[in-house]
């Protein structure tokens, strides 16, 4: 590990020199790329330097303990040795996590697709609850949310809805939300007071760059139509809504949020690219991982990941066995406690897999 850290520190110094070079700065695209690489290494280098300083201080205290006869100074050195030993253990653990393979999509913006599952109108209302939860969470993170497309019901639910979430680290946090979410509650329409179980499916897709995936224009069928709102009524007098069908896969994407047909087409293309990229990544991951599945979950849309139990005010994440009794605040966007636990479990699994490889 130390050899790798030394290499990273040297690379960081090299990048520091490059990004301050006027000839490099003249090429803005290259300069921005180097700046990002420099910023990505900064936290590792700073932690490593703190680790080296703590090691030096520890050796110094050990030397002092060998040579010093004064009782008070010896006790002081022993106390410092104890503190520094613990600090070094913490820093070593932190460095191990920092050196884990990074998901290249973590810094990307995302598309969240929510679809009502089993449960009819109640499932559509639950899909609406999930959209509100993610919107509130995005507000807490100062992320921007844009509606791409929606298919609303008459009483305020969503058969399906797609939104874009833009902000630093959006995918790194929201990627754990992919899967089947289950709700247990008494529907407003239920006169007998029986608890019903409904589901909604969430897919979180990273927004991909043009270089990440190439789409042949001949593989697309593009249809335009008038946008509709709640209950199906027309909300636009022009054919501004866009439906794109990817003929080889049968994937269909719609966008009607913008008044401009061109903007709707651009947004729909971004979602299509994200879906095709996700499909390609899933295929690649399956071939690499074979039968091995992450404890945190595969992110498969068919995997039941979380239950929201209204009578008990309980949320249970089935991937890691986490139970929280804070349903109201959770649905208001306070989901970081669950996400942090999932991140920690994911890191532990990666470290375990790294050990298998090594």
Swiss-Prot record:
Keywords: Cytoplasm, Methylation, Protein biosynthesis. Methylated by PrmC. Methylation increases the termination efficiency of RF1. The keyword Protein biosynthesis applies. It is found in: Cytoplasm. One of its GO terms (molecular function) is translation release factor activity, codon specific. Coiled coil: none annotated. InterPro entries: PCRF, Pep_chain_release_fac_I, Pep_chain_release_fac_I_sf, Prokaryotic/Mito_RF, RF-1. Its main location: cytoplasm. It holds the Pfam family RF-1. The keyword Ribonucleoprotein does not apply. One of its GO terms (cellular component) is cytoplasm. SMART domains: PCRF. The modification N5-methylglutamine is found at residue 233. PROSITE patterns: RF_PROK_I. Peptide chain release factor 1 directs the termination of translation in response to the peptide chain termination codons UAG and UAA. Belongs to the prokaryotic/mitochondrial release factor family. This is Peptide chain release factor 1. The gene is prfA.
């Amino acid at each position: 590990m130390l050899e790798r850290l030394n290499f990273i520190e040297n690379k960081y110094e090299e990048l520091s020199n490059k990004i301050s070079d006027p000839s490099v700065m003249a090429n803005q695209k290259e300069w921005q790329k180097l700046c990002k690489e420099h910023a990505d290494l900064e936290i590792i280098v700073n932690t490593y330097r703190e680790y080296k300083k703590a090691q030096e201080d520890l050796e110094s205290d050990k030397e002092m303990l060998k040579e010093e006869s004064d009782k008070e100074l010896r006790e002081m050195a022993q106390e410092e040795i104890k503190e520094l030993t613990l600090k070094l253990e913490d820093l070593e653990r932190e460095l191990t996590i920092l050196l884990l393979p990074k998901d290249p999509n973590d810094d990307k913006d995302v598309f969240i697709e929510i679809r009502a599952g089993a449960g009819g109108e109640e499932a559509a209302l639950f899909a609406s609850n999930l959209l509100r939860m993610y919107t509130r969470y995005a507000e807490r993170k100062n992320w921007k949310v844009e509606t791409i497309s929606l298919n609303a019901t008459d009483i305020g639910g969503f058969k399906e809805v797609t939104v874009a979430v833009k902000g630093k680290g959006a995918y790194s946090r929201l990627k754990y939300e992919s899967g089947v979410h289950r709700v247990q509650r008494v529907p407003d329409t239920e006169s007998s007071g029986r608890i019903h179980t409904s589901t909604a499916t969430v897919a979180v897709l990273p927004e991909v760059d043009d270089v990440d995936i190439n789409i042949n224009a001949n593989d697309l069928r593009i249809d335009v139509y008038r946008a509709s709102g709640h209950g199906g009524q027309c909300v636009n007098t022009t054919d501004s809504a866009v439906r794109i069908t990817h003929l080889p896969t049968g994937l269909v994407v719609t966008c009607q949020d913008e008044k401009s047909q061109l903007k709707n087409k651009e947004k729909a293309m971004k979602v299509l690219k994200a879906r095709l990229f996700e499909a390609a990544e899933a295929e690649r991951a399956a071939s690499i991982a074979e039968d091995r599945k992450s404890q945190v979950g595969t992110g498969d849309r068919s995997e039941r990941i979380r239950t929201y139990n209204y009578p008990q005010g309980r949320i249970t994440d089935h991937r890691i066995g986490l139970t929280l009794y804070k349903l109201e605040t959770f649905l208001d966007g306070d989901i970081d406690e669950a996400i942090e636990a999932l991140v920690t479990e994911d890191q532990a699994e990666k470290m375990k897999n790294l050990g298998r490889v090594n």
